[in-house]
């Protein structure tokens, strides 16, 4: 949902329907083990209170499908994923309560929706100032494994490794190259950077002419980190006729 929200915003901006400063949007996932909460934050299209009523409170109403229909002449290649309007509700499989705090890209107040999985919910004015949506899962006592960073990291990599929007999960230390005038025995410096768990631009999204042999080897190692030998060969086809497809092996 966070990916779709960001892709929608990018598409609206790209076709000039609205004047939007998209920037470099990132999806952030945060674990609050002490508070027993999981946060998913995006900088996408956001929702008004009316849109939350429409897209969240109506089961099986797909906002993605509606968007694709509205912009059917230009959005077919936008990469939007959702289709059935049901994915959000899986949150209640692990959460005893879910909150949505959202501010639309439109000039309207933010909204704050809360539900415990029953037919009852609250929808109030929010205090969010920045565009986008934050989902807060209050993790149930029977699903404590979803408060473990290793578990969340594993799931993010497994299901989002090649999502087209960068996904931040904490930070990491990055080793900087030694300076040219470094002396023997000098240790390289490190800096703290965002830990981006996915590759938003994998090899198959690029043209073969723009890739070198080392790019394919790097992609192979990314797919098979425990395989220490280089691939024997690679085949990369981009075919467009009545049906277009990309093939990389």
Language model features: what each stretch is:
Residues 2-141, 145-146, 154, 161:
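GHKL (Bergerat-fold) ATPase N-terminal catalytic module, capturing the glycine-rich phosphate-binding loop
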Residues 80, 98-120, 140-144, 150-249:
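GHKL/Bergerat-fold ATPase module in large chromosome/replication-associated machines
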